[in-house]
Amino acid sequence: MEEGWLKARANHGRIGQYLLTNDSVGCGTSRRFSSHPHPRAPERSCSLPRGSEDCDGFLMRPPTKCPYHKPLGFESAAVTPDQISCSNLEQYTGWYASWTANKARLNGQGFGCAWLSKYQDTNQWLQIDVKEIKVISGIITQGRCDADEWMTKYSVQYRTDENLNWVYYKDQTGNNRIFYGNSDRSSCVQNLLRPPIVSRYIRLIPLGWHVRIAIRMELLECMNKCV
């Protein structure tokens, strides 16, 4: 895909653009976006900057390339707590009750600012139910805001119905694709899905981590036009 601007609008009103390149974009490292008038260091927000068009609408038929991408709503809270779940949810008691799947929201701050997996192995997962079949075109991840804990790599599963088996997102060789994630607590790393996923349920499967599996995230929805 040629370089261009990913035009996106968060549901809470912040409007802006992501720069699309042929590789994953680390928007907290090489490109830092913040709408806060006095951003704090070293925590770097991965917000959308002001100043672009107001984009809306999405494409239900999967394109090979997505011309526009819109945040699904983790950060804005348009994605509600009942849409996000995780492995071993019934064991999130005591201290872990503050670090449940619902806390896996991009740019979350304060105590309980991320999802922390209670167990550190590759059997863990973070799941999103988008409530209807959508075209998902990208994933943005961050680590834990207040400690050096993050996910370094992951795979993706999806399905259109809860009664169907999970399907792994594959690479061009037919193997399960490995997505590379974070290398610090605050930078945002964006991985675009080419082709995008047409699905209702999405799972992130952590394959590597620093100290502990810790995730803040956003999903990107594919749109065919900006209106």
Language model features: what each stretch is:
Residues 84, 135-146, 204:
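A short beta-strand element within beta-rich, extracytoplasmic domains
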Residues 129, 136-142, 154, 159:
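Signature of small four-pass
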Residues 2-131, 171-182, 227:
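Disordered, acidic Ser/Thr/Pro-rich linker "stalks" and the adjacent N-terminal cap
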Residues 120-123, 146-227:
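Trp- and acidic/polar-enriched beta-sheet ligand-binding modules for extracellular glycan
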Residues 121-124, 131-140, 198-200:
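Extended extracellular/luminal ectodomain segments enriched in beta-structured repeat modules
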Residues 86, 91-93, 137, 163, ...:
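A broad, structure-centric signal for solvent-exposed, well-ordered loop/edge residues
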